């Protein structure tokens, strides 16, 4: 019987990994002041999140094996999970600089913390390098070592492609709704979010257990990429229609000129008059203009459009899960667990 990991259990692995990373830096005789800086970055940036991506690795390994993990299996899976969290930290530190963000996880963004500034760019590079330090230390003799390295490299590049498309499509200081399209939106969410948040953790679990056949990876991708797209569309929906006390933040997609699912849906069905309203009010840092856009979303019945989309896409995902070929060790339960976590979520 598979066993779900807890955040406490997952967190308990991190100090050993942090020490391994600091030891690696010490091997180059890094001066103490810089070592302390690296330690602080490793304790601020990867920690403090929900760790959903990271915990998906041990959860998936346990579901694939259909039993609780041994200590060694758990350590390996959690280590791979922490590598996805380091990847996420690398992206977030960089994104926050690019977006001029103010806070992250309830604290000032890393680049806004005292004395950090643009040194954060180098810190982001070091967080990425940490992945490969840990891979070499703990997986050098693993049969899938090469595939694990390639998985991280490829997923990193895919995410950077999504980020590039996002930055060029929706700059905060230049509102041009002609840039937006559902095709661009789909590219952004698939590459910027779905690959590293949904596909990568399961691919890592399959590699850990030497079950990463081309067929298994393809089946996983065919389910997890649409699932990741659904997750992001849900996020966009909650940004406008969710309750701030549920989602833990006040939605800012309208003011931030985000190429979101809702604005693309609005553009697809708006009359010329309604489009003019969008062009005059979208992407402006103004409460009244935001209210005008929100009212337009209501007038266009976007909430119902989302609910119809949700039922359709979840039906398609369930059908794909039901058709999974389990002969090479893949398990339907892995995907059912992902879907159960996000279907009808309110935060």
Curated annotation (Swiss-Prot):
The lineage of its organism: Eukaryota, Fungi, Dikarya, Ascomycota, Pezizomycotina. PANTHER family: FARNESYL PYROPHOSPHATE SYNTHASE, FARNESYL-PYROPHOSPHATE SYNTHETASE. Isopentenyl diphosphate binds at residues 50, 53, 88, 105. GO terms for cellular component: cytoplasm. GO terms for biological process: alcohol biosynthetic process; farnesyl diphosphate biosynthetic process; geranyl diphosphate biosynthetic process; mycotoxin biosynthetic process. Keywords: Cytoplasm, Isoprene biosynthesis, Lipid biosynthesis, Lipid metabolism, Magnesium, Metal-binding, Transferase. Dimethylallyl diphosphate binds at residues 104, 192-193, 232, 249, 258. This is Farnesyl pyrophosphate synthase. Catalyzes the sequential condensation of isopentenyl pyrophosphate with the allylic pyrophosphates, dimethylallyl pyrophosphate, and then with the resultant geranylpyrophosphate to the ultimate product farnesyl pyrophosphate. Its main location: cytoplasm. The record marks 90-91 as: Important for determining product chain length. Binds 2 Mg(2+) ions per subunit. Its cofactor is Mg(2+).
């Amino acid at each position: 019987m598979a066993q779900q990991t807890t955040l406490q259990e997952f967190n308990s692995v991190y100090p050993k990994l942090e020490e391994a990373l600091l030891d690696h830096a010490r091997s180059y005789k890094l001066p103490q002041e810089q070592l302390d800086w690296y330690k602080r970055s490793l304790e601020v940036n990867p920690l403090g999140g929900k760790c959903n991506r990271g915990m998906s690795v041990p959860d998936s390994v346990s579901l694939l094996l259909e039993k609780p993990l041994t200590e060694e299996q758990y350590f390996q899976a959690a280590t791979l999970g922490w590598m996805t969290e380091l990847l996420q930290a690398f992206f977030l530190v960089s994104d926050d600089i690019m977006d001029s963000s103010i806070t992250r996880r309830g604290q000032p963004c890393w680049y806004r913390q005292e004395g950090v500034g643009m040194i954060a760019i180098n810190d982001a590079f070091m967080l990425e390098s940490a992945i490969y330090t840990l891979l070499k230390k703990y997986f050098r003799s693993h049969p899938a070592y090469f595939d694990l390295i390639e998985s991280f490299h490829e997923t990193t590049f895919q995410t950077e492609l999504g980020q590039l498309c996002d930055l060029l499509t929706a700059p905060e200081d230049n509102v041009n709704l002609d840039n937006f399209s559902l095709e661009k939106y789909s590219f952004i969410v698939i590459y910027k979010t779905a690959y590293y948040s949904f596909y990568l953790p399961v691919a890592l679990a399959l590699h850990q257990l030497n079950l990463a056949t081309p067929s298994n990876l393809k089946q996983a991708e065919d389910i997890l990429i649409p699932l990741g797209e659904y997750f992001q569309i849900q996020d966009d929906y909650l940004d406008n229609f969710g309750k701030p006390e549920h989602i833990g933040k006040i939605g800012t997609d309208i003011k931030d000129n985000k190429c979101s699912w809702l604005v693309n849906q609005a553009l697809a069905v708006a009359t010329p008059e309604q489009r003019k309203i969008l062009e005059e009010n979208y992407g402006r840092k103004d409460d009244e203009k935001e209210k005008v856009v929100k009212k337009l979303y209501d007038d266009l019945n976007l909430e119902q459009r989302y609910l119809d989309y949700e039922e359709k896409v979840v039906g398609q995902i369930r059908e794909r899960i039901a058709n999974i070929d389990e002969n090479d060790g893949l398990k339907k339960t892995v995907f059912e667990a992902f879907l159960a976590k996000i279907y009808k979520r309110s935060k």
